[in-house]
């Protein structure tokens, strides 16, 4: 295994950086031979779908599934033979049951088929009628590794570019509280311990990273960075992977900001960052983007994956609801494959102050449409925080914001 040690300090850093899904049809009684399949939608409209074949399918079954998608009014978006999963787009209201029937007739066993969201796919992301299926592991690089920055080596001079300061609402200007998280866990003291640190690459699945920010110059490997935000199709073009909001940059700074007497000091300033943009322009992270992000991390030598979000549009995903099961299954397959490849997966469990191990109701979902009040979520789970094997952490704060962070009681 190439992935080894020296990541404990990063786990603490990632933990402190975490703070950052309409109305559905009732569950369908899918035929036992074709698994869980969502009902026909009430009206036609542009929608993306997750399609999971049985886990033991081979290349021929995957090829058959891909070939059948256009015959029922769909367009293939991405195919992951290693997962037994495909994503497709269609305007047909009956796409899911029609595809399930076609696959059953062809002798292809299906685990689940269902939508990845509640709101319709925007016209700007239309793929039906001319989509070119993407190979998620082989997206063309926007630049070669030789042309991009040398990972892990900060530039001698920071570029003269406008920067954005993101204040901590609980900080006191000019005090240690502006970096209170690092102070609270005595990160500086830990960094002074003389140990040999293994080189670590952290994939940040988020809104993208501003790699021109002086605190992050040299930290981001742009040759391995990507956007998965549109239909879960990997795109390394600079304008695609450019950060859409500041959250990903904030997280990157907590983890690996250069120690350069400006801004904050990162917990692991020698770490290499890979920006995996997965939030779309509406600040939503859909299942197809998550699967793309994990497959990218798995195939691009990432050691740790940081997740400061919950997968949209459901805060809690129900594995027995055919409207949610397929997207959940696809996400878990991708996460488990990453874990089996040696990636450590760290995820935030939110900042709602609730017991996510025993959820009862949820009034915040779906996040892309009008939320359903008091939706029953017993037996449902948050993704990725509650996926088996994921290290889940919640946000914390100081009980007394006037106290010194190192000695403060955290809550």
Region spans (language model):
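Substrate-binding/access-modulating region of protease and related hydrolase catalytic domains
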Residues: 278-383
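C-terminal region of N-terminal signal peptides and the immediate post-cleavage residues
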Residues: 19-43, 261
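Active-site core segment of subtilase-fold serine proteases
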Residues: 158-270, 292-326, 359
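Autoinhibitory propeptides
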Residues: 32-39, 55, 63-176, 398-400
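Short glycine-/aliphatic-rich beta-strand segments at the starts of folded cytosolic domains
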Residues: 43-55
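Secretory targeting and sorting signals
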Residues: 1-30
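Extracellular S/T/G-rich loop segment that most often corresponds to the catalytic His/Ser-adjacent loop
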Residues: 369-411
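Loop/turn elements at helix/coil->beta-strand transitions in domains of secreted/extracellular proteins
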Residues: 108-109, 198-201, 269-274, 299-305, ...
């Amino acid at each position: 295994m190439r992935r080894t040690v020296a990541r404990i300090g990063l786990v603490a850093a990632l933990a402190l950086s975490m703070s950052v899904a309409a109305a559905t049809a009732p569950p369908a009684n899918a035929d036992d031979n074709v698994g869980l399949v969502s009902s026909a939608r009430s009206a036609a409209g542009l929608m993306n779908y997750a399609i999971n074949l049985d886990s033991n399918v081979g290349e021929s079954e995957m090829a058959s599934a891909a070939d059948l998608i256009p015959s029922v009014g769909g367009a293939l978006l991405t195919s992951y033979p290693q997962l037994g999963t495909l994503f497709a787009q269609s305007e047909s209201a009956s796409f899911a049951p029609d595809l399930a029937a076609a696959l059953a007739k062809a002798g292809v066993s299906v685990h689940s088929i269902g939508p990845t969201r509640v709101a319709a796919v925007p016209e700007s992301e239309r793929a039906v009628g001319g989509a070119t299926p993407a190979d998620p592991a082989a997206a063309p690089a926007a630049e070669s590794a030789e042309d991009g920055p040398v990972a892990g080596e900060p530039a001698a001079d920071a570029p003269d570019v406008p920067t954005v300061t993101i204040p901590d609402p609980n900080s006191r200007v000019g005090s240690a509280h502006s970096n209170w998280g690092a102070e609270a866990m005595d990160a500086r003291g830990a960094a002074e311990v003389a140990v040999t640190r293994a080189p670590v690459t952290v994939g940040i699945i988020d809104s993208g990273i501003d790699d021109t920010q002086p605190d992050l110059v040299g930290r981001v490997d742009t040759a391995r960075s990507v956007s998965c935000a549109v239909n879960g199709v990997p795109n390394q073009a600079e304008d695609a992977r450019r950060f859409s909001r500041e959250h990903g940059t904030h997280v990157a700074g907590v983890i690996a900001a250069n120690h350069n007497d400006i801004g904050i000091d990162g917990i692991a300033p020698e770490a290499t960052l890979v920006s995996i943009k997965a939030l779309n322009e509406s600040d939503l992270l859909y299942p197809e983007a998550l699967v793309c992000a994990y497959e990218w991390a798995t195939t691009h030598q990432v050691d740790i994956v940081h997740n400061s979000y919950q997968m949209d549009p459901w805060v809690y995903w129900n594995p027995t609801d055919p409207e949610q099961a397929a997207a959940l299954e696809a996400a878990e397959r991708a996460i488990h494959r990453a874990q089996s490849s040696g990636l450590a997966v760290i995820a935030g469990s939110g900042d709602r102050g609730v017991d996510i191990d025993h959820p009862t109701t949820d009034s915040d979902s779906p996040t892309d449409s009008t939320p359903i009040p008091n939706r029953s979520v017993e037996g449902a789970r948050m993704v990725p925080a509650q996926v088996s094997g994921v290290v889940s952490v919640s946000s914390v704060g100081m009980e007394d914001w006037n106290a010194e962070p190192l000695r403060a009681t955290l809550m």
